[in-house]
Design a protein with these regions (language model features):
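Conserved beta-strand segments of the P-loop GTPase G domain that flank and frequently precede/overlap
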Residues: 70-72, 94-98, 136-140, 169
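Switch I (G2) and immediately adjacent beta-strands of P-loop GTPase domains
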Residues: 44-82
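Conserved G1/Walker A P-loop phosphate-binding module
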Residues: 1-46
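Canonical P-loop GTPase G-domain recognition
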Residues: 143-199
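Conserved nucleotide-binding/hydrolysis micro-motifs of P-loop NTPases
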Residues: 22, 76-77, 100-102, 141-145, ...
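Conserved Switch II/interswitch segment of TRAFAC-class P-loop GTPases
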Residues: 89-111, 119, 129-130, 142-147
């Protein structure tokens, strides 16, 4: 939407990994943290003993010297309020589609929810103008035996009026294509910001860097 600004003037973009529970968001972020050398600082995780995210994971990462706060949302349906909180002010989204065929309905539920909460940002009314917030898809778990075909995912994106969405086929447990997808989303995020500035679109001044506050009881 609009990056925040640190006291030293550095712009900080916010990138969010969205998608159903078990889709691989935390696994992918942990891969970026542990294996790709892009992280600056620790990986913060608020999760339950079984590894399900309760609120978010958060990591500060640098891509070509640009700083990103990267969050994952808690995918379980009951954590809607937490997702809404994390989504605020997002500059770019990576949707983790669980390719396991059995998870089809969960993917659809999650995409619909995102469009309800953020549809005005990730959809464009005019095909010639890119949406305010770029979104890419990671079709994750491509190593599993019974996976949804990429064409079926494309059909869903077309029906959702996002026909040009870029899809990466990922395996988060082995890191396959995770960095490529991440760097692509990060670049889209920065590119979109400068496009907005160049075209004179209303870009509110960058606000101070913030973190989501924990939901109340
Ligand atoms: N086979 C396979 N398993 C994966 C892959 N990515 C993640 N997993 C597994 O899927 C399970 C769920 O992964 P998480 O990363 O915790 O999923 P999540 O999207 O963060 O889930 P929530 O925190 O509930 O939203 C874990 O057991 C992972 O090891 C993958 O690409 N292939
Ligand atoms: Mg998680």
């Amino acid at each position: 939407m609009c990056p925040s600004r640190r006291a030293d003037g550095t712009l900080v973009f916010k990138l969010v990994f969205w998608g159903p529970s078990m889709g691989g968001k935390t696994t992918a972020l942990a891969w970026v943290y542990e294996k790709e050398g892009l992280a600056s600082g620790q990986l913060q995780s608020i999760s339950d003993p079984t590894g399900r995210t309760l609120f978010f994971d958060r990591l500060v990462a640098k891509v070509s010297n640009v700083v990103f706060q990267v969050y994952t949302v808690a995918g379980q349906r009951r954590h809607k309020f937490q997702r809404q909180t994390v989504l605020k002010g997002t500059d770019a989204l990576v949707f983790f589609w669980d390719s396991d065929q059995a998870q089809w309905n969960e993917n659809i539920y999650s995409l619909k929810e995102l469009l309800q909460m953020y549809g005005n940002k990730v959809l464009s009314s005019d095909i010639k103008i890119p949406p305010e917030v770029p979104l890419i898809v990671c079709a994750n778990k491509r190593d599993l035996p019974n996976i949804t075909g990429i064409d079926k995912i494309k059909d869903v994106l077309k029906a959702a009026k996002m026909p040009n969405t870029v899809i990466f086929e990922t395996v988060a447990i082995t890191g396959t294509n995770v960095k490529r997808a991440f760097v692509y989303a990060a670049r889209e995020c920065v590119l979109r910001h400068y496009q907005k500035l160049k075209s004179g679109e209303q870009v509110p001044p960058a606000s101070p860097e913030t973190e989501p506050t924990a939901p109340g009881p």
